[in-house]
């Protein structure tokens, strides 16, 4: 034998209220779209002439300028190129310059 106990939790009460609202609202078929008082009907899709006018205003994309910062890197932030790569590159440049100087002498 099972006994049903009503659930008294906020979610259950909210869903019961929503069910009540859904049962008491007017069905969508009865709402319908009717012309406004001024006689104009509702327009769902944009007017093609508005589209052409809008496109003429957008001849180019806006430019965004991002300037590099010289501040310290926060921990966990990734940077490119990595500092180790820059150090290795500087060492290679120094080695190549030294080799050229030795050949010239």
From Swiss-Prot:
Q: Where is it chiefly localized?
A: nucleus
Modified sites of kind Phosphoserine:
63
Start and end residues of each stretch annotated as Disordered: 86-105
Stretches of Acidic residues bias are at 86-96
Tissue specificity is: Highly expressed in heart, and expressed at low levels in placenta, lung, skeletal muscle, kidney and liver.
Give residue ranges for domain LBH: 18-104
Q: Which InterPro entries match?
A: LBH (IPR013294), LBH_dom (IPR038990), LBH_dom_prot (IPR042945)
Q: What highest taxon heads this organism's lineage?
A: Eukaryota
Gene Ontology biological-process entries? mammary gland epithelial cell differentiation; negative regulation of DNA-templated transcription; negative regulation of intracellular estrogen receptor signaling pathway; negative regulation of stem cell differentiation; positive regulation of DNA-templated transcription; positive regulation of mammary stem cell proliferation; positive regulation of somatic stem cell division; positive regulation of somatic stem cell population maintenance
Report the locations given in the UniProt record.
Nucleus; Cytoplasm
Q: Which UniProt keywords apply?
A: Cytoplasm, Developmental protein, Nucleus, Phosphoprotein, Transcription, Transcription regulation
| Pfam families recorded | Lbh
The protein's job, in short, is: Transcriptional activator which may act in mitogen-activated protein kinase signaling pathway.
Its name, as the record gives it, is Protein LBH
Give the species this sequence originates from. Homo sapiens
């Amino acid at each position: 034998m099972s006994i049903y106990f009503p659930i008294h939790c906020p979610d259950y009460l909210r869903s019961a209220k929503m069910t009540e609202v859904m049962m008491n609202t007017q069905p969508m078929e009865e709402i319908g779209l009717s012309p406004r008082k001024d006689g104009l009907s509702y327009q769902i899709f944009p007017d093609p002439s508005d589209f052409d006018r809008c496109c003429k205003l957008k001849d180019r994309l806006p430019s965004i300028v991002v300037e590099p910062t010289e501040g310290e890197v926060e921990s966990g932030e990734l940077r490119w190129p990595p500092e180790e790569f820059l150090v290795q590159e500087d060492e290679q440049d120094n080695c190549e310059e030294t080799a050229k100087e030795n050949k010239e002498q």
